[in-house]
UniProtKB/Swiss-Prot annotation:
Keywords: ATP-binding, Cytoplasm, Disulfide bond, Nucleotide-binding, RNA-binding, Transferase, tRNA processing, tRNA-binding
Gene: mnmA
Gene Ontology CC entries for this record: cytoplasm
Region (Interaction with target base in tRNA): 118-120
Alphabetical GO biological process terms: tRNA wobble position uridine thiolation
Molecular function as annotated in GO: ATP binding; tRNA binding; tRNA-uridine 2-sulfurtransferase activity
Site (Interaction with tRNA): H149, Q365
The protein's name in its UniProt record: tRNA-specific 2-thiouridylase MnmA
Active site, UniProt feature: C123, C220
Enzyme Commission number(s): 2.8.1.13
Compartment(s): Cytoplasm
Annotated spans, Interaction with tRNA: 170-172, 332-333
Amino acid sequence: MLISNTYNQHFPQLTQEQIASNATKKVICGMSGGVDSSVSAFILQQQGYQVEGLFMKNWEEDDDDDTDYCTAAADLADAQAVCDKLGIKLHKINFAAEYWDNVFEHFLTEYKAGRTPNPDILCNKEIKFKAFLEYAAEDLGADYIATGHYVRRAGDNENAKLLRGLDANKDQSYFLYTLSHKQVGQSLFPVGEIEKPIVRAIAEDLGLITAKKKDSTGICFIGERKFKDFLARYLPAQPGNIRTVDDEIIGRHDGLMYHTLGQRKGLGIGGLKNAGDEAWYVVDKDVENNELIVAQGHDHPRLFSKGLIASQLHWVDREPIRESLRCTVKTRYRQQDIPCVIEPIDDETIRVIFDEPQSAVTPGQSAVFYLGEVCLGGGIIAERI
């Protein structure tokens, strides 16, 4: 039996009754080959559950895609090594077709329309908490699935609530707002109750191969490649003019899809005559005319919005908001909470008014709402106001 003193210091000892109850429950833990899922599986073991791992392959590499292939192969090898060390079975499943149909094609459509989508949110919605959850329950007989996400849940089954992770720096509730209370109730999030350094310390105690493995960053199907190079393989770029808010053409862009609101670097328009020293920022995209709109200064009024319109709403309790609600919102990951008021337009659309104007609110991204620690849900930013 593997032992971690760090685990013993940070997790309460369960009663024999709790362990006996957990022992009747089968949990399939999604194993990514990273430290968070590795430690999640160990925690579940310590709590008495019947634990098995599952490695998902969500992307098919091209034959010339050596970098990504090696990454996927290495991740699988690490996941297998961890499961071997923990003494648990590792299942393998290929969800690449589901990923292409339900995540990647939507990603391309949104970029084509000049919006900036977040595929990780869609991946959680369509793959990890739908395809994986269904496969685990129906084919593997799971009572729960588990992942290495930094979130917590309160309550069970129909009453489950999604809470922020204990580690504010790692909280991933922003990426899970589309989950229903039912999905939350069928999921366990073991590392959501602790901070990242403790996760690594537990992995070190156990001698896991993933203990010092760096966290994966960026979009899963792009890996370490340059985003621009990857996107160019699927969407032909349409170069166009860069126009100032004063209606002056000052340069050319190589495709609207490569730029996002609030962007400062990589515009190629520095050193313009009589332009002053202030940096240029993207303040808008004119999709109809294929023009990138820019202005000088990080506090230019065109960068700011007093609110937003959101659609494609998902509330964790699946009850639409039908009256004004004061809460907080994040319009991008790791942003400080913004105090706001939600004003329902209809069951599918809301108007959100910020207490103070906010910079670089980006259509296509998600607005996610909170009441204290509870993640209420969210929607896609349709427009800024």
